[in-house]
């Protein structure tokens, strides 16, 4: 373990994984409870397009990515709320279009870009600046959640009830999707755009198999996410060997998927046993 801490990139990776493991489940709980889990996938693809635009223009890539992701995510939410098209159709259009835009622009770019690192992340790609960005976003998410927890909870449970109580639902919807977009952008270097949505959804799905309490679900999800993220990052370091470097995101998602499968099977077996005992 001390060997890992002797490398700056590993220290950054461990800190980043801790911050992401706390932040992602908080936002993920509100995403899952509103039954818009696929929004995470779409937002990650929008981030991919944003990165490609920034690289292609060679003009403050990070700020360009943030700006594009925020604008595109707000447009996505607006179209989903307008009922002009089915929400699934809107997500599908943004999902495929953003991936296409990103692929074309990166191909046309004069810069040498490792697409695999953008898609899946890399331990070697994480910088101290990335950690600072993650910490800023993480603290913002925690503070906002603490001060607006009650309203966010009611909105997640019942939109109509929230409107009756004169809660500005649109504001909190916009806030959720903007924070999620920014979190995805600042976490791309570590986990990549393809698997970041799994960190939003899987820990929550695991926690929901263990408790029905909203607040407890968040805390359990954070615990599970911390366990899998730290294990995934550490395993990535020990399993990788030049020139083969295993992205930590893949290992993290495999661990989360395995735990989800286990708790799901265990719960189903309990239900089956109860049904059998009643006959």
Regions found by a protein language model. Name each.
Residues 4-13, 56-63, 84-89, 123-133, ...:
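Interfacial loop-to-helix junctions that mark the boundaries of transmembrane helices
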Residues 246-279:
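Cytosolic-side transmembrane-helix boundaries in multi-pass membrane proteins
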